[in-house]
Amino acid sequence: MRLYPGDIELLGTLARMPFLDRLELAALSGRSRAAVYQRIDRFLEAGLVESVGQASELVTPTRRFCLSARGVRRLASEEGVPFAQLLSTRPVSEQWRRLLLERLDAAAVIYRLVEQAAQFTFPLGLRWQRAAPMDAVLELTEGRRAAVVRQGRTVDRTGFAKRIRRLKETPGHGAVLVICPDETRLRHARRLVAGPPAIAFLALERDVALAGAEAAVWRGPTGAARLTLREALGYALPASGERSERPLVRVSLPEPLDPECARALWMLPAALTTAEKRALDLVGDWPWLRPGHLAALLGVGRRRLTQLLARLDELGLITRLARAGAPQLALSDRGLAYLARRDRTSVGIARKRWSPEPRGSRDPFDWRNVSGIRSRQLLRNLEHTESVHWFNTLLAGQARDQGSRLVQLDPPHRASRYFRSHERLRSVQPDAYALVETASGEQAFFLEWERRAVRPATMAARLAPYLRYYATGRPLEDHGLLPRVLVVFEDQLAADHFL
């Protein structure tokens, strides 16, 4: 195949930014969509590029393209450099490909951000980061650079705070764009990024993926004013002292993306459907979930649920354990690794906390024999755990029936809030946190499922953390509204005693 200068430019763009779709490639190359579609078809016929499918809750199904081994060799030849140099200086090696495939859903959102920025600034570039605190660096005109940081769904407060601390110590960018999964964590991140050295802007991941370039969805670390992406990037200053990442020591030409690779861990983001990814997120949030409860949270029937679970079972992503005659669902170690790598968190820590695997293979199944510390605790108190799951299913079902939207439903490890009261660090540890969007506005609440708080001393101990929390200004600061505390009782007797 003969390559024209425009073809070499398109291949070079895919070498710098693998797994762009056609529309994103058109926006970043400055060529028409029709021309890009035509050239991609020719590249596929010549074996210069390969493609994978990708879809998520925030990104509609699309095909994403990357250079094949033949494409890497051809681009190196056209640019007059050894292909080994191309492998070490651009993210086209097999090692880089696997890393980006593991983060494909996150990469898709960041590419949407870059596509929006290309509408008002050109030329525009993006450099992926392998181990730096930022996910990528957006290269603007006039030597300006903006760091892009995505906070994943499974990232905990401590891990993200460490990333932000490292980011502030990393030179080379004049602004920071932080993408957060929900309003609560956006407000927490806003406190972390406030202050020098670079100005920071934050937005919800859903808004970044679905809103247009002119939508005012970006917020500064202080003040309530919302800015468009153009306005936010207008504050980016030229940066100096950039510290480049150390290149990979061992690189190799990319392997073909054969159908046999679909079971590989790094291919899961391309192999899984949106519904399957949603099911994995819910099982990850609520370990030991009953299949019926999962169906209610997903809003699907029994037949569809059976199909989803069969597929996840086949890929080895979930574990089914029978306890008291009822099946319970949890993420397998492989499923935990999939979520951890998607969100740039530690696989080892995820397994240490949540693994359902037995500590002793010969010991009978029991909560004492579960290796994950938090999974063990939830299984030990399974009656309470299932009660909270049951309440969640009722909430999700009623929200759908009444035309409301369940915006946020956080499990205990994300629902906890930490604050200072009388110079001491305090916390509230609810069973869940929910945010529901109704016709009359947003309603938020902490859930407390009560079975034993029937004695005065016990009741006081349960309510004291909330009284301290609401005595500060943090509830409004953390949520943008005042959440209620919803106490649910198992029977009328417990309710009477509590009240």
Regions found by a protein language model. Give the residues of each.
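Accessory beta->alpha helical hairpin/"wing" motif in late/C-terminal subdomains of nucleic-acid enzymes
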Residues: G53-E79, L321-G360
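Leucine-rich, amphipathic alpha-helical/linker segments
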Residues: F83-L113, I349-A396
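A short acidic, leucine-rich amphipathic alpha-helix
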Residues: R22-G30, P291-L298
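Active-site metal-binding core of divalent-cation-utilizing nuclease and nuclease-like domains
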Residues: V52, Q95-K162, S375-T385, T393, ...
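A short, conserved structural fragment
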Residues: L44-A55, D313-R323
